[in-house]
């Protein structure tokens, strides 16, 4: 059986600060959208043209602070962003303009998501609340106090499982919570982390949830029953997690590297580290930032066909990895 590993295919350079989120198109088209602490969102065309893997097609501006998250509608027509300015924005990508502003959170918005049918939007904030909106920018429900998180809500996701419509949230209170989307009531609290949770990820079939954060441990949960299945040690703070769309793999962006696990064997498929020397040889302009700065990955997204892993870093670069068989 052939082994698989990932190789650096190229980089994408336009952001001037941390790349906080990457959204890839559901139809595997040549567009990706990224958000950054430079307060902008960039729409890219993937060209696969030598070391410069893609070119910035449009820069979307309007947020007054770091843009922390961005997602795409399934038809690729709209992007949705959340910012430390406390707002969400819905962007018309054809026009390059803000179609809607969502105002209601009282502190930084840390995470946004679209439901599978794109008709509902969920957001998470440092104000410790989760808000459910329609696409007109009207807040339909606020989850706060009571069963809600007792600290910043760092990440929120819809489960792709339509039979049991669910919102999954992760928080600095060290828990992951599962909410019933139909009535916004708490279904389960998943406790086990010893530090804040940065990111829950839901598997493509909606059966599994992976969570990670400060303690460097990834916990795998059965989403239906809320049972902890097993844990994976990453060794350093986890900033982002994502499941491969077509392999039984989980990727973790940690402070030391990007680690990819095969969940069947629970073994590491690859451990991706940045090689600045190799990159300056690949690119004509050399590396933009200081040679000795600690650079780590803050955002991850697979292409829809699972062949390409896009990773965003603290130096503003997007590094693009492709699967090699050997």
Swiss-Prot record:
Pfam family, one: WD40
Regions crossing the membrane: none
GO CC entries: cytosol; nucleus; ribonucleoprotein complex; ribosome
PANTHER family: RECEPTOR FOR ACTIVATED PROTEIN KINASE C RACK1
Coiled coil: none
Full protein name: Small ribosomal subunit protein RACK1
Known function: May have a role in cell division.
Domain of life where this protein originates: Eukaryota
Signal peptide segment: none
Keywords assigned: Repeat, Ribonucleoprotein, Ribosomal protein, WD repeat
Tissue and organ expression note: Predominantly expressed in roots. Also found in leaves, flower buds, shoot tips, stems and young seedlings.
